[in-house]
Regions:
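Metallo-beta-lactamase
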Residues: 6, 78-129, 224
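Conserved beta-strand hairpin/beta-sheet module of binuclear metal-dependent hydrolase folds
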Residues: 1-46, 120-137, 152
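Active-site metal-binding loops of divalent metal-dependent hydrolases
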Residues: 8-10, 38-41, 57-58, 113-115, ...
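Cap/insert and terminal regions of metallo-dependent hydrolase folds
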Residues: 141-228
């Protein structure tokens, strides 16, 4: 599998040369191009030419069709909530939560994560020749057992030290820290982790400072940047 981070920026005003576009990942396997998320500030789909798109949730930095139409005739796999939130009619396929489904050569599991009150989110466990997790926006997974048997964890880089967990009544929303996710990797024996979807604090820190902060032996932590590619 070939992974290309088309964008690595969250829904923040801050940006940099390395973090310009909203977080999006292109996964290519056996000639099939799977795009994960496509926000308002993204490379045009006519240039990416994905065979299918899967979407984590209906926030504008992940789902352009909340505010702006973009022509695409392929299938877009979304939750029921995301489909309802779309202002434009597209070729949507509804994801059944906690049930595996097939897209091209990939087996995919969409599972609930706690992140937003108005746009319920999911993460993805994706199997090709290897298995990886994609959690660009979350506080916590509702079922951490999805972390078992993972070759790579791709997670939420919104915050390093700032507490971005908020509460309304008894419900939580927001983002967890990078270190919390690294600790999950340690617990489940995941040796490789990459962070994307950077917020204000991490963008101001810069990639070199982030890499130094999280350099360790148990988990090989990498900081993704726009146009970064890797083979899994």
């Amino acid at each position: 599998m070939r992974l290309k981070f088309l964008g690595t920026r969250g829904d923040v005003e801050e940006s940099s040369r390395k973090h310009k576009y909203h977080s999006s990942l292109l996964v290519t396997h056996k000639g099939f191009k799977l795009l994960i998320d496509h926000g308002l500030i993204s490379i045009p789909l006519r240039k990416i030419k994905p065979d299918a798109i899967i979407v984590t949730h209906a926030h504008p930095d992940h789902f352009t069709w909340l505010k702006k139409d973009e022509e695409y005739k392929g299938k877009i796999y979304v939750t029921r909530e995301t489909k309802r939130a779309s202002k434009f009619k597209k070729n949507f396929e509804v994801i059944n939560i906690d049930k595996w489904f097939k897209v091209g050569p990939f087996k995919i599991l969409g599972y609930r994560v706690i992140h937003s009150l108005i746009a319920p989110a999911i993460g993805f466990k994706i199997k090709g020749n290897k298995t990886f997790i994609y959690n660009p926006d979350l506080i916590v997974m509702k079922r951490k057992s999805v972390l078992k048997g993972i070759d790579l964890y791709i997670g939420d880089g919104s915050t390093v030290t700032a507490n971005l967990v908020r509460r309304k009544d008894s419900k939580l929303f927001g983002h967890t820290r990078i270190q919390t996710q690294v600790n999950w990797c340690k617990k489940y024996g995941i040796k490789e982790a990459i962070f994307t979807h950077f917020g204000k604090e991490p963008i101001r820190w810069g990639d070199k400072k982030l890499e130094k902060k999280f350099k360790q032996e148990e988990v090989n932590v990498k900081i993704a940047h726009d146009n970064m590619t890797m083979t899994l």
